[in-house]
């Protein structure tokens, strides 16, 4: 579920973790007031889709109109960095340990899943947001929506 030592994460593995976290996190409207992940994931997916063409267009447009190459490249690099910033943030968030209030709720949701007959892997170390995302995804598939009433 989570890595035993969340602090020793490679810089480039954060992008991979961020992509995995964005695919794991359930994009439910009832989670949006509590967790910022819904907005960050939507904006990151938007940036992954539209920023590369915008960067190419900006670069070609400034060069075609006789602009300088330096600002054109800087603008293109900034546009290309936006999706990477979103994935990096999601990767950092996925390995962040849960705060105490959310940790109690995490264990409540796990308890409800186990009461419904689901077999869950034991939690190793202190649970992080990736463990929460895995648990919430499974809870939305297996349980009714009333498990969110305690949130």
Swiss-Prot record:
It is found in: Cell inner membrane. Keywords: Cell inner membrane, Cell membrane, Membrane, Transmembrane, Transmembrane helix. InterPro entries: UPF0208. It comes from the Bacteria. This is UPF0208 membrane protein YfbV. The keyword Transmembrane helix applies. Its main location: membrane. One of its GO terms (cellular component) is plasma membrane. Pfam families: DUF412. It is a multi-pass membrane protein. Belongs to the UPF0208 family. The keyword Iron does not apply. The lineage of its organism: Bacteria, Pseudomonadati, Pseudomonadota, Gammaproteobacteria, Enterobacterales. Disulfide bonds: none annotated. The chain crosses the membrane at residues 46-65, 69-91.
């Amino acid at each position: 579920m989570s890595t035993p030592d969340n602090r020793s994460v490679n810089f480039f593995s954060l992008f991979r973790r961020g992509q995995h976290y964005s695919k794991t996190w359930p994009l439910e409207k009832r989670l949006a007031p509590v967790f910022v992940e819904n907005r960050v994931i939507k904006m990151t997916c938007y940036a992954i889709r539209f920023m590369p063409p915008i960067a190419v267009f900006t670069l070609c447009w400034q060069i075609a109109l006789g602009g300088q190459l330096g600002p054109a490249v800087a603008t293109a690099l900034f546009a290309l960095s936006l999706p990477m910033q979103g994935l990096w943030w999601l990767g950092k968030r996925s390995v962040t340990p849960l705060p105490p209030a959310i940790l109690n709720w995490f264990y409540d949701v796990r308890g409800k899943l186990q009461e419904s007959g689901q077999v869950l892997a034991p939690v190793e170390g202190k649970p992080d947001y990736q463990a929460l995302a895995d648990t919430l995804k499974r809870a939305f598939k297996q349980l009714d929506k009333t498990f969110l009433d305690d949130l």
